Regions:
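Short, hydrophobic/glycine-enriched beta-strand segments
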Residues: 3-9
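Active-site-adjacent alpha-helix immediately C-terminal to a catalytic or transition-state-stabilizing loop
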Residues: 4, 62, 70, 75, ...
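Phosphate-coordination/substrate-recognition cap region in phosphate-metabolizing enzymes
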Residues: 40-128, 187-211, 215
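Glycine-rich phosphate/pyrophosphate-binding loop
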Residues: 121-147
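ANL superfamily AMP-binding
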Residues: 32-48, 158-164
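Amphipathic, non-transmembrane alpha-helical scaffold segments
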Residues: 29, 33, 54, 58, ...
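Glycine-rich N-terminal loop/short-helix segment of MobA-like nucleotidyltransferase
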Residues: 11-26
Length: 224
């Protein structure tokens, strides 16, 4: 049997302010930092040990990883992969969710947020939150906007190409990512329908343990 831990980053500044975040690189709140430390304490108390970790390119996931491992009292190698980034929210990035609903209508915003294959408006070239010229994404085709279906298309190959071989080699892994990249991964693992996955809520800072059989099929999962 194999175990892998999935952890959504702690509360970010824009989570707190109810802004669309996407690929915008925002920090954790103090509460988010405490969530990361508490996650580490829970993992330590559960006796979980890791050989390797993965985060997205976004600092809210990196800082969550650092604080979680510090709270566990361990120092393991971990690396970032852009395919674990949050869903790109296009021109909605940086906008207040309630004000956006007032501007475009609550039904339209809900469609952008919670449908499986509908993309929000593409980010404009002059938008201050456009990452296309960010040097850390050099060589990567940065999306202009993504649906959850688009996130699945990039997350599943990451799992198949990177994580599966490591698990088969009995590596113990922790992944710190964002709500929608974890939704995409869970959809694949649990073979969920689009309707099921868009209704799934993943809390910040709560370790989610997946137990997998020798074929890497889920046996069960649970939060600590």
């Amino acid at each position: 049997m194999h175990k892998i831990v999935l952890l959504r980053h702690g509360e970010s500044l824009w989570n707190q302010q109810k802004l669309f975040t996407g690929w915008t690189d925002v920090d954790l709140t103090e509460f988010g930092r405490e969530q990361a430390r508490e996650a580490g304490q829970k993992l330590k108390a559960a006796g979980l040990v890791f050989d390797l970790g993965f985060t997205s390119y976004l600092k809210r996931t990196k800082l969550t990883m650092e604080l979680t491992l510090q709270a566990m009292g361990v120092d393991i190698p971990w690396r970032a992969d852009w395919r674990l980034n949050e869903r790109h929210y296009g021109n909605l990035q940086g906008l207040n969710k309630e004000q956006t609903a007032e501007q475009f209508g609550a039904e339209q915003v809900q469609l952008w947020r919670r449908s499986y294959d509908v993309r929000p408006p593409e980010i404009s070239e002059d938008n201050q939150y456009n990452q296309k010229n960010d040097p850390k994404y050099q060589g990567i085709v940065v999306p202009s906007a993504e649906s959850l279906a688009d996130v699945v298309v990039r997350v599943v190959p990451f799992w198949q190409e990177v994580i599966e071989p490591l698990l088969r080699n009995n590596q113990r892994i922790i992944i710190v990512a964002s709500g929608n990249s974890l939704r995409a991964l869970i959809k694949y693992l649990d073979q969920m329908t689009p309707k099921e996955i868009i209704e799934l809520e993943i809390p910040t800072g709560q370790p989610l343990i997946y137990e997998l059989d020798d074929q890497l099929q889920p046996i069960k999962h649970y939060y600590l």
